[in-house]
Amino acid sequence: MQREFPEVPLVGVGAIIIEHARVVLVKRAHPPLQAEWSIPGGVLEVGELVRQAAIREAREETGLTVEPGELLGVYDRVLRDAGKRVQYHYVLIDFLCRRVAGDLTAASDAAEVRWFVREELPALNLAEDTLDVIRKGFAKL
């Protein structure tokens, strides 16, 4: 599967993990969005169901075992290079998730992982669709 300059869009999942008025974000260790804070998540594997992928990605990136609940949104993430070619194209399916076990630990693609309260989010320069889905998650609690 070619992530950079793909021939077709890739399907990804996001796990919006909210607990005690805080949300889990990971600092990406690899492109795209390397060194930026983001929702835990990643690309589906062949034969994997979207909720299974959300569970796997949350565990891989945060050390937490989660239970995916409500679908919060489906978003397009298209990033272009300097020549305006599509460098990355993802269709992202984001679920509100509840932690059922585990301790927060950066793993896999995450350089860092931590809990954030709402008031900290504006300073992180998150993408507008990322902020939107996090707001939706907070509104459901």
PLM features: what roles do these ranges have?
Residues 1-14, 85:
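Acidic, metal-coordinating catalytic segment for phosphate/diphosphate chemistry
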Residues 9-12, 91, 109:
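Short, basic and Ser/Thr-rich N-terminal targeting/leader segments
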Residues 15, 71, 95-97:
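A structural signal for short, well-ordered beta-strand segments
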Residues 19:
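A cytosolic small-molecule/anion-sensing beta-strand core signal
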Residues 22-60:
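Conserved Nudix-box catalytic region and its N-terminal flanking loop in Nudix hydrolases
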Residues 65-74:
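A short coil-to-beta-strand element that immediately follows conserved catalytic motifs
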Residues 76-103:
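Active-site-adjacent beta-strand/loop module that shapes the phosphate/pyrophosphate-binding cleft
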Residues 94, 105-137:
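NUDIX/MutT-family hydrolases
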